[in-house]
Each structure stands twice: as structure tokens, then as C-alpha cells.
Amino acid sequence: FGPAAAAYAASPVHRAGADLDAMLALGREVAARRVLDVACGAGHTALAFAEQADEVVALDLTPAMLEQAAALAAERRLTNLRFERADAAALPFPDASFDLVTSRLAAHHYADPAAAVREAARVLRPGGRLMLSDIVASDDPALDTFLNAFEVLRDASHARDHRIRQWCGFFRDAGLAPEVLGPWPMQIDFDAWVERIRTPPASVVGLRALFDHAPAPSREAFGISDGYDFRLTVAVIVGGISAGS
């Protein structure tokens, strides 16, 4: 992700969205003062929460992403952020450290999403919330397979777009009672999508062929256009730690 960091800093779908608006609104509602943004990427979510929280810790595994996030924070003159390099499945913080843990458009890269959810739950204070936004797969097995096939072809680091019910299961297993915000459609510009992650030319050809030969239900579900633009689905899963925990 290092070479792609600048492209993610400029990405419209990472900079804004209905899912981010919903996360920010809930953050204000619960008056979260100390926030951890996991797999922060270029920092858009962390910076947005820094506008309304006392302190935000932005965490990512990729140094270039952290550098981009720090540069954006400096541009906006935000001084209540700090940046740390660490893995979502091994958070370097004590138990009960944060009012809110967020992760946006990143969890499809998690090698062990269940472990990441458990770690997020561990560092939440009583009454705290985990808010995880990501692209979600359909409960239809054929649509699920098609989605994850083209995601991997575009980006070999893709692990899986999970179904909403799978995320809810991860939350329950970590002791979090899940609720779902959304889902919302996310319109994708094909050319920008492959350029952002520097998809190899041969894989771009493969993606176009995959879309050209997609079954009618897949073309309809993903809104695939003649120019290859298409539509994904995003949802936010929210889980809370009981104040009595």
C-alpha cells in the first residue's frame, strides 16, 4: 500500500460517504472523547473524528499511509492526533483505553477479522462502541463469489468482503451486541478504482473480461455499466460494551 498512499489521500470514496456521516453522527451522540481509528489508511476517518473528539489515535501497518495521514492533519492544523504503526489484531494499548474504536473501508484486508474485533472490544471502555464500516457481500452465494473474485483480481492483498451476518457474528463472539447502519450504495469509477491501487495491466484486462462476461444477475446487482463503472454496498456494524462490564 505504500506506493498507493497518495492516491488514497485523494480518493473521493475514502474522503467522504454516507457511512462516514453516520459514524460521525453516532460519535457525537455518544460523546466519544478518546477515539482509536484502526487501519486508518490516509487518515480521512481519523481526521474527521479529530474535529469532534479530544484525542484520536490513528493506527496503520503501512508507514507511507501514516505519513499521508500526518501530512493531512498538518494541513488542517489538527493537533489532537497521534499516529502509531501496529496490526489491527494486536493493538498496543491497555484494556479499556478508548471510548470509541473505528475502522472504515479497511477490514476486507484483515487476515483475521475475528481477532481484530476481539482486540477492538478489549480496548473499549465500559459504555464504549466499535464502529466498523466496510464493503459487504450479498447473502446470495453467487454474488458473494463474484464480488470477492473481482476484488482479489484488482488487489491481491484483498482478503474478503464479508456478509453483514458474518460481521454480526464476529461482534457477538467478542461480547459486542451488533446493530447495523445502512447499507448504502457506493458508486465506483472503474478507472480510478484500478489506478488507485496500481492494478497490473494484465489484471485490468482480466477485470474488464470478467465484467463483460458477468451473468445477468451479477450485472444487475452491481450495476455494471458499458464503461465498467459499477456499484458496491457499504454498511456500518456498531457494537457496544455494556456500561456495567
Question: Whereabouts are the PLM-identified features?
Answer:
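Conserved class I S-adenosyl-L-methionine
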Residues: 1-30, 44-48, 65-68, 131-153, 192-194
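Class I SAM-dependent methyltransferase SAM/SAH-binding core
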Residues: 36-38, 42-90
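Conserved Class I S-adenosyl-L-methionine
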Residues: 42, 113, 177-245
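A short acidic, Gly/Pro-enriched loop at the edge of an enzyme's catalytic core
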Residues: 89-100
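A short SAM/SAH-binding and catalytic strip from SAM-dependent methyltransferases
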Residues: 99-111
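A short glycine-rich, Lys/Arg-flanked "PGG" loop and its adjoining helix->strand segment in the class I
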Residues: 114-126
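Short alpha-helix
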Residues: 160-174
